Regions:
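Membrane-proximal helix-turn-helix segments that form the acceptor-binding/catalytic region
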Residues: 57-64, 85-89, 104-123
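A charged, aromatic-enriched C-terminal amphipathic alpha-helix characteristic of glycosyltransferases
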Residues: 292-299, 305-340
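N-terminal pre-catalytic "stem/leader" segment of glycosyltransferase-like enzymes
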Residues: 1-90, 273-278
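Alpha-helix capping/helix-boundary segments
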Residues: 76, 129-131, 270, 277-278, ...
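A short, active-site helix/loop in glycosyltransferases that binds the activated sugar's phosphate group
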Residues: 105-108, 119-143
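Nucleotide-sugar-dependent
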Residues: 225-266, 272-280
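A short acidic/histidine/glycine-rich donor-binding loop in glycosyltransferase catalytic cores
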Residues: 285-291
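Conserved catalytic-core segment of nucleotide-activated headgroup transferases in glycan assembly
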Residues: 152-229
C-alpha cells in the first residue's frame, strides 16, 4: 500500500505550505492512504503541535510490511522516529525534500542533516545539483529528483493580447530591504522597462529609480495567476544585483524556489540567475532567460524579439499545464516506488 503522513499546516498562505498541501492532494488523487490525522490548518501553536503529534503517533499502527510511506521533509523532531517505526513495521520510507535546514536557517549542521536523512530509503531531491550535494556529503539513501514543484490551482492565467516592447518584469515575494536588498539597487540599471512588485514590505522611497517600480501589494496566489501584470517573472535573491549573495541567494544554487512554479502558472517566462539550480530546467525547456547579473537585463530585454518572446510564452504555457496536473510529483513518486 502507498501511504503518506498528513499534519497540521499553520495556514496555507506561505509558499512552503502550499507546496506541501499540493503534494498531499496529488498523493490523495493517486489513491495514497493518509496514515496520520486529517490535514488541519490551525495557527495556534499548541493545537498545531498536538494534532501533528497525534498523527505521528497514529501512523505506525496503520503501516504494514511492504508499504511505502511518503514523508515531506523537514518533519523536524518527528522525522527519525517515524522512519524508525516504519522500518520496524517492514515499510519503506520515501522522502520529498522541501527545505534543507543546514543551508538558509542553519538549524542543523550538515552532518546532523545527513544523519537524519539517512533514515530514509529513498530521497526525492529538488534537482541534480541538490542530489549531488547530498551524495557528496554522505547521503546513503537512493536518490531521485523532482525537477520542479507542481502548482495546483483551479484558476487559469488570463490570455493576453500580443506582447509589445518594452517588456515588464514581475517579482513576487518578500520585499523588505532585509530579505531582498537587491530590489533597492536594481532601479539604477532600469531605463526602458518597469518592475511590478507583489508582496509585503516594499519601502519604495528607499528604492533607486523608483519611477520604474509599480508596487502592487499582496495578492493571493490564485488571484495572481488570473491577474498578473508583467511579461516575465524574476527569480533572484540576496543583497546584490551582480550575483545572488547571502544565505538566501546562495541557496538558489541547490533549491527550487516555489515562486518559479507560480510564475509559470501565470504563463510568465522566467528570468533567473545563471548559477541557480533551476536555470538548467529553464534553458532545457526554453521557458525564459538565464542571466549572470541584473545589470545586463536592460540590454537582454531590448534585444529580445517579439517572436522569440512569443515562443518562450508558448513553451511556458505547456509546462504550466503539466504543473497544474501534478505531473512532476507523480513522475518522481512512480520512479521512487519502481526503484525500491
Amino acid at each position: 500500500m502507498n501511504c503518506y503522513l498528513s499534519r497540521n499546516y499553520k495556514g496555507l498562505s506561505s509558499a512552503g505550505n502550499k507546496a506541501k498541501t499540493d503534494i498531499e492532494q496529488i498523493m490523495k488523487d493517486l489513491s495514497f492512504k493518509n496514515v496520520g490525522l486529517k490535514q488541519t490548518t490551525y495557527r495556534n501553536k499548541v493545537l498545531s503541535f498536538l494534532f501533528t503529534l497525534a498523527g505521528v503517533l497514529k501512523a505506525p499502527f496503520c503501516l504494514h510490511k511492504g508499504d511505502y510511506l511518503v514523508l515531506q521533509y523537514p518533519l523536524k523532531k518527528y522525522f527519525s522516529f517515524v522512519c524508525n517505526m516504519a522500518h520496524q513495521k517492514g515499510a519503506k520510507v520515501i522522502v520529498i525534500i522541501h527545505d534543507l535546514g543546514s543551508f538558509r536557517r542553519k538549524a542543523l549542521t550538515i552532518e546532523q542533516e545527513i544523519s537524519r536523512l539517512n533514515h530514509a530509503d529513498y530521497i526525492i531531491a529538488h534537482n541534480e545539483k541538490m542530489k549531488k550535494w547530498l551524495e557528496d556529503n554522505g547521503c546513503k539513501a537512493k536518490l531521485g529528483i523532482l525537477g520542479i514543484f507542481d502548482y495546483l490551482s483551479a484558476t487559469s492565467a488570463t490570455p493576453k493580447q500580443d506582447t509589445e516592447k518594452p517588456y515588464s518584469v514581475l517579482y513576487a515575494g518578500a520585499l523588505s530591504p532585509r530579505k531582498n536588498a537587491f530590489l533597492y539597487e536594481v532601479g539604477t540599471f532600469v531605463h526602458s522597462f518597469n518592475l511590478n512588485l507583489y508582496g509585503n514590505g516594499f519601502e519604495i522611497n528607499q528604492a533607486k529609480g523608483k519611477e520604474h517600480f509599480n508596487y502592487m501589494g499582496f495578492v493571493k496566489s490564485d488571484d495572481l495567476i488570473a491577474t498578473a501584470q508583467g511579461d516575465f517573472g524574476l527569480v533572484w535573491d540576496g543583497t546584490s544585483v551582480s550575483t545572488c549573495t547571502g544565505d538566501f541567494g546562495e541557496y538558489l544554487q541547490y533549491n527550487n524556489p516555489h515562486k518559479t512554479s507560480l510564475y509559470i502558472r501565470c504563463q510568465l517566462p522566467v528570468i533567473i540567475w545563471n548559477k541557480a539550480a533551476l536555470a538548467d530546467f529553464v534553458r532545457e525547456n526554453g521557458i525564459g532567460i538565464c542571466v549572470d547579473s541584473l545589470e545586463e537585463l536592460e540590454k537582454i530585454l531590448n534585444t529580445l524579439s517579439e517572436e522569440e518572446y512569443a515562443e518562450m510564452k508558448k513553451r511556458t504555457a505547456k509546462i504550466g499545464e503539466q504543473l497544474s496536473q501534478g505531473h512532476f510529483v507523480r513522475k518522481a513518486l512512480q520512479e521512487a516506488i519502481e526503484r525500491l
